[in-house]
A protein has these predicted regions:
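His/Asp/Glu-rich metal-coordinating catalytic cores
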Residues: 1-155, 159-162, 179
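Hard-cation-handling environments
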Residues: 123-252
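Acidic, His/Gly-rich catalytic cores of divalent-metal-dependent hydrolytic chemistry
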Residues: 257
Length: 257
């Protein structure tokens, strides 16, 4: 799945940032043609060192790296989820004792709200906005976060229309293509079947003609269809916005917070 998602994300980056990079579609195609797909726990040896990938539990196909050389073991992670999510099982930490660990620390200095509490807050807010005949806009990352938010709402018994837009729809197709990576593929398939897909401007206008929940990239409000929804919904007090993604410094989402 990482192979498919990488191509999708890089192409989207080029589309948004246009001529700001020294590479384009031909270079991407060349990179993909020379790429090798490696499965989890598949040991690769180079010289006197070996490495293998383990599931990070963060996004589908997301990996940590276990490196061994000269009887020493190093464990390297990017984003990692030790508890798992509605979509994915937790990170694979069946790795034994390590000599060194290098890990991300995005929230290491923060006390995060318990997951059940944050999910309940989102569900309650969604119902509150719908009850006052408004639309709830949830800007969200295309990969995993959009799908997770939809799963939280639908699995809670939320019976109102949920719309999904943008690149998240293509990511849905990738996730459905690799059910063996998902925690419960049948539940996820049911969620996607209940979500209303919006693919063009006319469908967006029709979608906003009645109270609903809209899930759309970009998660930090940097471009994407999120800009359209924000402009359409921000001047009506009945509507609401829920920021469920990390907001980087200098982004519109961070300023809104």
């Amino acid at each position: 799945p990482t192979f498919d998602l990488s191509k999708l994300l890089i192409q989207d980056m080029i589309k948004i940032e246009k001529n700001s990079h020294s590479f384009g579609v031909p270079e991407i195609d060349n990179m993909m043609a020379k790429s090798k797909i490696i499965g989890f726990k598949e040991k690769i040896t180079r010289g006197n060192a070996s490495f293998e990938l383990r599931s990070s539990g963060h996004v589908i196909g997301g990996s940590t790296v276990l490196v061994e050389s000269k009887n020493k073991k190093l464990f390297y992670t990017g984003d990692i989820n030790l508890r798992g999510s509605r979509l994915l099982p937790p990170a694979d930490l069946d790795i034994g004792e390590m000599d060194m660990v290098i890990t991300e620390s995005t929230y290491s200095q923060e006390n995060q709200m318990p997951r059940k509490e944050s999910e309940k807050g989102l569900i309650d807010f969604a119902n509150e906005v719908i009850d006052r005949k408004g639309t709830l806009f949830i800007p969200s990352f295309s990969v995993e976060r959009s799908q997770e938010v939809a799963s939280v709402l639908i699995n809670s018994g939320f019976n109102h229309k949920i719309i999904m837009d943008g690149m998240a729809l293509k990511v849905n197709e990738v996730l459905l293509k690799y059910p063996e990576y998902l925690r419960n593929p049948e539940i996820f398939k049911d969620v996607i079947e209940k979500v209303v897909s919006v693919r063009d401007h006319n469908e967006r206008k029709r979608a906003l003609s009645e109270p609903c929940v809209v899930i759309s990239p970009a998660g930090m409000l940097v471009g994407g269809n999120a800009v359209y929804y924000l402009q359409e919904l921000s001047f009506n007090d009945k509507n609401g916005i829920a920021l469920v993604s990390y907001q980087g410094e200098g982004t519109p989402g961070k300023k809104l917070l």
